[in-house]
Every structure is written in structure tokens, then in C-alpha cells.
């Protein structure tokens, strides 16, 4: 009798991919088998893919190249035979973001051992803003601004002419619809709130800049606007 395990696991949360994660995964693979053969395949925004045999080679390449990483596949074979135990871990920050773990094993106990180790490792690299990565953040921001305008005008007893009211409502509806439909807005959102954050080579510098923009949007625009209205509302009772 021969046991065969074919399993695919998909994860909805976002992850940070950096050298520490890749070295941790490599260590897990080598602990299981010294015969492990690693391959890292990276897809970039120049429509090209690059294949590396080790972690250091991958980082050295992207230290010199400005290509934006879109997806990465980490494959490992535990042997040289075609039917050797295999694992493929995929991270995709494209139009259809994905984190996927595939197993082909001939032993159920070994499969569960590796699966648990990899998942424990990934848990340490979850993105702090991963919920925002999945939410339609741009329409939500427009909605928050729209609600803030409504609340503020109500507090101050400001009555806009009918034309202005229709214009504000129209901007909100058209803006929310456009952001959802047009790909350019999806790409902007995917850059500011990525489901997968690749901190590899020059991509780490890009992620640092995006983090500053993300903090400005969440901290200054949203929280600042809400706090401003709350403070204004409270001041009406005090003064």
C-alpha cells in the first residue's frame, strides 16, 4: 500500500515577506531533509520572472534591480526523484491576491508536521493592517468624508442649496463606483494596502514610502477628520 497526500491550503490574511521569513522557511525544510532542493520564482512588474536557487542570490539580485515584485513562489523538493515529497508556497499581490500552500507527500504524519511548522512561522509575519487590505478602503474613505460633511453641516445648522447637495452626493456615488470599477484605483489601493508586502532589496524602500502614505491616510485624514468633528460637537455643549 502507498499513501499519497495532495492538499491545498489558502489563507486570507496578509503577510510580510522578508529575508528572515525566507531563511526561517529554509531552516524548516532543511530540518526535515538535508536533501531538500529549494527554488524561488519571482514575478515582477516588467512581465518577467526570475528563478533563484537560494535566498542570498534572490536578495543580491533585487538589491541591484528596481523591479517591483508582484508574486513569489517558493518550491522545495525533498529528493531528486520526480515523485519526491514537495511543497509549494505562493504569495501573490496581483489583481487577485493569494497566499497558498500546496503539499504532495507520501506520509500523512510528515505532511501535518511540515504544515504546522510553516503555519506557525507565517503567523509571525502577518501584516498589522491585513484587514484593511481586504476591505474596499477607498469607497470607505469617501463614505467617511461624506458622513462627516453631513454631521458637521447638521451640527452647524448649515443648509446647502439643493444643487450643492446633489453635487456632493453625486461625487460620493460616482467616486465610489469609479474606484471599484477602474483598475488604476485597484492598483493604487494594492500598493498602499498590499495583501502581500515584499520587503526584498529595493522593494523594501518602496514599502517604506508606502507605509508613510498609509499612515498619513489613516492617521491624518481619517482619524483627524473624525476627531475634529467630535471635538467640535463636544465644544458646542461646553461653550
Regions found by a protein language model. Give the residues of each.
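Broad, structure-driven detector of short, well-ordered beta-strand segments within folded domains
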Residues: 80-94
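Residues that cap or initiate secondary-structure elements
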Residues: 46-48, 56, 80-82, 107-109
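Hydrophobic beta-strand residues in large extracellular and virion-surface proteins
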Residues: 40, 72-74, 89, 101, ...
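Short Lys/Arg-enriched alpha/beta "domain-start" segment
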Residues: 1-72
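Short, hydrophobic/proline-enriched secondary-structure or compact coil segments at domain edges
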Residues: 67-80, 97-105
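Intrinsic-disorder-associated interaction segments
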Residues: 14-18, 22, 48, 107, ...
Amino acid at each position: 500500500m502507498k499513501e499519497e497526500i495532495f492538499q491545498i491550503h489558502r489563507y486570507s490574511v496578509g503577510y510580510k515577506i522578508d529575508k528572515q521569513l525566507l531563511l526561517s522557511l529554509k531552516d524548516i525544510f532543511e530540518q526535515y531533509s538535508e536533501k531538500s532542493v529549494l527554488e524561488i520564482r519571482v514575478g515582477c512588474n516588467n512581465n518577467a520572472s526570475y528563478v533563484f536557487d537560494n535566498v542570498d542570490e534572490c536578495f543580491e539580485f533585487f538589491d541591484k534591480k528596481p523591479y517591483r515584485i508582484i508574486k513569489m513562489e517558493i518550491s522545495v523538493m525533498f529528493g531528486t526523484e520526480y515523485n519526491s515529497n514537495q511543497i509549494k508556497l505562493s504569495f501573490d499581490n496581483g489583481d487577485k491576491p493569494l497566499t497558498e500552500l500546496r503539499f504532495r507527500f507520501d506520509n500523512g504524519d510528515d505532511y501535518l508536521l511540515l504544515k504546522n511548522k510553516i503555519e506557525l512561522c507565517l503567523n509571525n509575519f502577518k501584516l498589522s493592517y491585513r484587514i484593511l487590505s481586504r476591505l474596499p478602503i477607498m469607497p470607505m474613505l469617501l463614505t467617511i468624508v461624506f458622513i462627516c460633511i453631513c454631521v458637521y453641516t447638521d451640527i452647524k445648522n448649515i443648509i446647502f442649496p439643493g444643487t450643492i447637495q446633489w453635487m456632493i452626493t453625486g461625487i460620493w456615488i460616482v467616486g465610489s463606483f469609479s474606484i471599484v470599477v477602474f483598475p488604476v484605483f485597484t492598483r493604487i489601493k494594492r500598493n498602499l494596502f498590499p495583501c502581500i508586502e515584499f520587503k526584498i532589496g529595493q522593494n523594501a524602500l518602496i514599502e517604506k514610502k508606502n507605509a508613510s502614505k498609509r499612515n498619513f491616510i489613516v492617521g491624518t485624514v481619517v482619524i483627524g477628520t473624525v476627531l475634529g468633528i467630535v471635538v467640535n460637537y463636544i465644544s458646542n455643549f461646553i461653550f
